[in-house]
């Protein structure tokens, strides 16, 4: 079976947006106009084809990125739906990693929201070119030009409108295409499937000319030949303008901007045209960086059918009918179902049972998958998110994804004995699907703790336990993941010697303990010279310290951001052993920590609250009571925006308090930002409670 769509006609795109900007509706309409779905699903009634997990249907928010294939004008579009809620940024990061381009959807009323900034930063981090779609132009308060301004101000980007709206709110009927200089008006009777191309209405001609001039100038800046032509007063052809927009979009010096109303079926076809005209094919993005596992040297993987198979597993889902699905982005070569792949991350071979092409809620079996495709593999047992699958003959490890540590933990207790066994298995499966979710056992109490990126994240996990795995569980109070660190440098010596008949134990070390930059982690430096400690015992000292740092001296929380230098010591020919040096390292670290001015750290959340002006004073007063530091106050569409850093421990139950303080008119979002020092009076309470 040969390739159906040439590589240069494939677009792997994601639709990324703030919650409620209308992302799922936009994905739905794309599937409708490209002929995949026959009845349009609305998020409001919980039937959208992209939102296929049950909890999403209830909450009306998109949680998992479903990958769907559709076709438009001889191009194949692989659509990856990304979640817009801040607790799920790990899902967004993960999909960004495998996209070639993105459509950023903004609400014409809400504009640039805090979550949009996070998603935008992630797209910058992974170098993903994007186009902007300003949605909901039919809503009261819709303002395309205000969103253009916010993208400049808040996202520091260079938005270049390639179409502008005709009318707004209930008079929004279509757009002016600034490339062709024509008006496109949608026909309400055909659910937006048909539209007419007309002359530009006279009252908008001036505005259209002004924006066309801006567009041409932005395009000319992309290419010297075009610049000369433009400065010489010559007209640029439509082809030249399109080429310039594409160049600027791919090198991210400009962001093409369009508008429409997905819900009212207007502007979706022009968006699809822009996807195939301006977003990159797999052949137009930079080669993917990887590491050769044998030599550890950097190698580049070129997107092409030639060469040995290489792909990245970016998502794992459990499907009730076929078991585990591993979503893979193929970068190079091709693979037939039933063949073996080599997991270079784990150094293991696995057999691919079936290859499935996903259409949001139905699936088709395919015989072979090619470069540039996104496909679900069935039958892989050991492959996890972020693993590389390739051909052993030309092995490569594609760059690893980095996953954040959880900031919140909740104890879960199974209700019955039967639930207990099922719960362990279920939590294991959920942790495989989602690397930002962790499961651990609390040593002192033997309770099972689950950790994640926020309350909603864990609520959904508990909900999935009940629904998908039929496990009934009670949950405890949320607990914050505190950390400890040190503030001063100390040198300490510890001699561990035991002589009590038979073979003794002897390990003797001198260490220097120093604080490091926040977020920089642990560092071990060996400065032993002249063999005062034999080199086979050095790793044991490091291991002893790493075990001891899991339980800090203040309250038993993990210790972070410090450097240990092992600079002297001694050993005994007969009595020294790895064990003795491990204990010596561990004891020396504990003694040094006590003397190094240890402090408690807590997760600080970046909180953005949006409230009507009359509640502003109450909200700020409340944030101050929660030990918040107010960073800025802005206006957005008649509402006040307060930005603050607030300790996570003070934010439990905030949504209820905010609702009652603002009569339901305030909204907020929060995400983990950094670890900050806990004030000493509060730290004292926490330590006493822990030890009590």
UniProtKB/Swiss-Prot annotation:
Gene Ontology cellular component annotations, sorted alphabetically: cytoplasm
Pfam families, sorted: EF-G_D2, EFG_C, EFG_III, EFG_IV, GTP_EFTU
One BP annotation, GO: ribosome disassembly
InterPro entries: EF-G-like_DII, EFG_II, EFG_III, EFG_III/V, EFG_IV, EFG_V, EFG_V-like, G_TR_CS
Main location: cytoplasm
Subcellular location: Cytoplasm
Domain tr-type G: 8-283
Record-listed GTP binding positions: 17-24, 81-85, 135-138
Name the UniProt record assigns to this protein: Elongation factor G
Native source species: Helicobacter pylori (strain Shi470)
Protein's gene: fusA
């Amino acid at each position: 079976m040969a390739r159906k769509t040439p590589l240069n006609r494939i677009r792997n795109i994601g639709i990324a947006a703030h919650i409620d900007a209308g992302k799922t509706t936009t994905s739905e309409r794309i599937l409708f106009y490209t002929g995949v779905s026959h009845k349009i699903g609305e998020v409001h009634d919980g039937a959208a084809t992209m939102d296929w997990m049950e909890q999403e249907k209830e909450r009306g928010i998109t949680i998992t990125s479903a990958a769907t294939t559709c076709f438009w004008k001889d191009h194949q579009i692989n659509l990856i739906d990304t979640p817009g809620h801040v607790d799920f940024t790990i899902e967004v990061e993960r999909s960004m990693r495998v996209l070639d381009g993105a459509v950023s959807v903004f609400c014409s009323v809400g504009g640039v929201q805090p979550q949009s900034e996070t998603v935008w930063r992630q797209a910058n981090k992974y170098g993903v070119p994007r186009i902007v779609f300003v949605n909901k132009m039919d809503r009261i308060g819709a303002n395309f030009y205000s969103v253009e301004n916010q993208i400049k101000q808040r996202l520091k980007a260079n938005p270049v409108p390639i179409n502008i709206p005709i009318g707004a709110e209930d008079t929004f009927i279509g757009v002016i295409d600034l490339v062709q200089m024509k008006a496109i008006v949608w026909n309400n009777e055909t659910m937006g499937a048909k539209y007419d191309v007309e002359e530009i209405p006279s009252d908008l001609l001036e505005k259209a000319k002004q924006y066309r001039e801006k567009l041409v100038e932005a395009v000319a800046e992309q290419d010297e030949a075009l610049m000369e032509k433009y400065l010489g007063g010559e007209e640029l052809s439509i082809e030249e303008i399109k080429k310039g927009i594409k160049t600027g979009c791919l090198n991210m010096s400009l962001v093409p901007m369009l508008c429409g109303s997905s819900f009212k079926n207007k502007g979706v076809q022009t968006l699809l045209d822009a996807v195939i005209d301006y977003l990159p094919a797999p052949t137009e993005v930079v080669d993917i960086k990887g590491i050769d596992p044998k030599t550890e040297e950097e190698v580049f993987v070129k997107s092409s059918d030639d060469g040995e198979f290489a792909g990245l597993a970016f998502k794992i889902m459990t499907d009730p009918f076929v078991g585990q699905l591993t979503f893979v982005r193929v970068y190079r070569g091709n693979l037939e179902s039933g063949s073996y792949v080599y997991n270079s991350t784990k150094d293991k071979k696995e057999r691919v049972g079936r290859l499935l092409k996903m259409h949001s809620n139905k699936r088709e079996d395919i015989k072979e998958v090619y470069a540039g495709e996104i496909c679900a593999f069935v039958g892989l047992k050991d492959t996890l998110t972020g693993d590389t699958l390739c051909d052993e003959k030309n092995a490569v490890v594609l760059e690893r994804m980095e996953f954040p540590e959880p900031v919140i933990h909740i104890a879960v207790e199974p209700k019955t004995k039967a639930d207990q066994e099922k719960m362990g298995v279920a939590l294991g499966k959920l942790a495989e699907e989602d690397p930002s979710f962790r499961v651990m056992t609390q040593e002192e109490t033997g309770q099972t703790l689950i950790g994640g990126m926020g309350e909603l994240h864990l609520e959904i996990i508990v909900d999935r336990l009940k629904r998908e795995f039929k496990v009934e569980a009670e949950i405890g109070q949320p607990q914050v993941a505190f950390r400890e660190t040190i503030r001063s440098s100390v040198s300490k010596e510890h001699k561990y010697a035991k002589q009590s008949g038979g073979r003794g134990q002897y390990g003797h070390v001198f260490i220097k303990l120093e604080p490091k930059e926040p977020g920089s982690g642990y560092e071990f430096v060996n400065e032993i010279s002249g063999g005062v400690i034999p080199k086979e015992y050095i790793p044991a000292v490091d291991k002893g310290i790493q075990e001891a740092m899991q339980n800090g001296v203040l309250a038993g929380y993990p210790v972070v951001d410090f450097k240990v230098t092992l600079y002297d010591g001694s050993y005994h020919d007969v009595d020294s052993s790895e064990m003795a040096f491990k204990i010596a390292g561990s004891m020396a670290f504990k003694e040094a920590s006590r003397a190094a001015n240890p402090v408690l750290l807590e997760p600080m959340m970046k909180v953005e609250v949006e409230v009507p002006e009359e509640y502003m004073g109450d909200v700020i007063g409340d944030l101050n009571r929660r030990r918040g530091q107010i960073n800025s106050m802005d206006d957005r569409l008649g509402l006040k925006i307060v930005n603050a850093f607030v300790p996570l421990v003070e934010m439990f139950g905030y949504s209820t308090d905010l609702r009652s303080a603002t009569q339901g008119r305030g909204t907020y979002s929060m995400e983990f930002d950094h670890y900050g020092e806990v004030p000493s009076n509060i730290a004292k309470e926490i330590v006493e409670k822990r030890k009590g």
